[in-house]
A protein has these predicted regions:
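Charged alpha-helical initiation segments
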Residues: 1-26
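Surface-exposed polar/charged interaction patches
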Residues: 17-20, 69, 136-139
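N-terminal interaction modules that seed assembly of large macromolecular complexes
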Residues: 19-56
Length: 140
């Protein structure tokens, strides 16, 4: 399979998970992993199909692939926005850290949770990001 097909497949799987009325912990983790894999394959596809002169990215994890792609002048503004503290990658990393955190029962805190609203936000941000990248690359 081509990288773009794998990216779309993982995105479809994550959307199917959101289509369920109730999501359990294992499905939350699968959702996060699928979105991350989809982003990783999308980065590979962009790298493979463009004339961008960058260091190889196949050995990097998802986040660092995008950081390397952000060195491209044509893509810098789009990717940097999503790498910021309010961007897609930060939201995804927060969701992952929430999933793996251990709550300290001795502390009184209000802790952030993963919920359907957050996962829908991730999918919406990802689709908008992907569409903007596609339009930019088609114009270049």
């Amino acid at each position: 399979m081509k990288n773009i097909e794998l990216s779309n497949l993982y995105l479809d799987i994550s959307q199917e998970i959101l289509g369920k009325s109730l999501i359990n912990n294992s499905e939350e983790l699968i959702f996060i992993v699928c979105v991350e894999k989809s982003l990783s394959y999308l980065a590979d596809d962009i790298y493979d199909n463009s004339t961008i002169d960058l260091n190889p990215i196949e050995h990097l994890n998802c986040l660092y692939k995008w950081k390397e792609l952000s060195n491209s002048i044509a893509l810098r503004n789009i990717i940097t926005k999503e790498l910021s503290s309010e961007g897609l990658f930060s939201i995804l990393e927060k969701s992952k850290s929430i999933f793996f955190r251990e709550d300290n029962k001795n502390l009184i805190t209000t802790s952030e949770i993963n919920d359907l609203k957050k996962f829908n936000l991730i999918i919406d941000r990802y689709k908008a990001f992907k569409e903007l990248l596609r339009k930019t690359l088609d114009e270049c």
